[in-house]
Amino acid sequence: FLPLLAGLAANFLPKIFCKITRKC
């Protein structure tokens, strides 16, 4: 469960960061 969650976060967080900071 945790590795899956970590993988999901690793895939999801950069997209949020990209939207917030507008640095992609």
UniProtKB/Swiss-Prot annotation:
It is found in: Secreted. One of its GO terms (cellular component) is extracellular region. The keyword DNA-binding does not apply. GO terms for biological process: defense response to bacterium; killing of cells of another organism. Keywords: Amphibian defense peptide, Antibiotic, Antimicrobial, Cytolysis, Disulfide bond, Hemolysis, Secreted. The keyword Ion transport does not apply. Pfam families: Antimicrobial_1. Expressed by the skin glands. Its main location: secreted. Transmembrane segments: none annotated. InterPro entries: Antimicrobial_frog_1. Disulfide bonds join 18-24. Shows antibacterial activity against representative Gram-negative and Gram-positive bacterial species, and hemolytic activity. Belongs to the frog skin active peptide (FSAP) family. Brevinin subfamily. This is Brevinin-1E.
